[in-house]
Amino acid sequence: MSINIGEISIPDLPIFFSMFLTIYLIAYFIVFRNWKPQIRPEASSCLISIFHGSPAVFLATRAVFSSSERSFASANTAAQNTVLDFSVAYFLTDLFHYIVFNPNDVLFIGHHVATLFVFLTCRFLVFHGACAILGLLILAEVTSACQNAWTLAGARKNDPESRLAVKVYDLLSPPFYAFYSIVRGVLGPLFFGKMVAFYARGGAHGVIPNWLWISWAIVVGIAITVSILWIWNLWIELFSERKANKIRVDKKIR
């Protein structure tokens, strides 16, 4: 799709990219200008994630369910392509953020490159499969708002001038971990399994090549595995910290 300005038709992707880049720069130079230099880039990344996550869930849900064809192999609709453009623009912006400020963070850079591969091939190579990709996007971003609030609080929890951040971080951690665990540890694998089974049975024969859906499956499978390991480690840290705090309290009482 494209946006018409007068007699000029501008593709969605450049407009969305300009939007996310502008939000990032405003966040870095204005919104978080008083934050420590070490955490300003991360906070700015969180802000563009906030502008992407929940809107992407809403737009993707609407794009999928407004279509009469909702097969994992059905042709992409114009609305679905717009959502793909929206997400590609976000991941491109965030990828540049990591390349500039965290070039050694190979895990996130690799994640963003792989995600862009999935979105771009669905959008511009085969023109099919958006229902599957957007379904995964919904599951990936439905936890975004909570995760970004938790991340922003975590970035400032060690700042003596921000006691509120510690309280927010401690308050959000258990429910966020539980929500994330259900979505990424249960719903995500179930949807992923359904998608792989569909393609393995030849459901997309003739429209999505085997090498491509297998590539998608590898990317998504690795992402789900890493997410599960990440949240598992956070649960371990949470229980370890609470156990240590309980021991300290018991010692004080004695």
From Swiss-Prot:
It comes from the Eukaryota. InterPro entries: At5g14285-like, TLC-dom. This is TLC domain-containing protein At5g14285. Its main location: membrane. The chain crosses the membrane at residues 12-32, 45-65, 82-101, 124-144, 172-192, 211-231. Keywords: Membrane, Transmembrane, Transmembrane helix. GO terms for cellular component: membrane. It is found in: Membrane. SMART domains: TLC (SM00724). Residues 38-248 form the TLC domain. It holds the Pfam family TRAM_LAG1_CLN8. It is a multi-pass membrane protein.
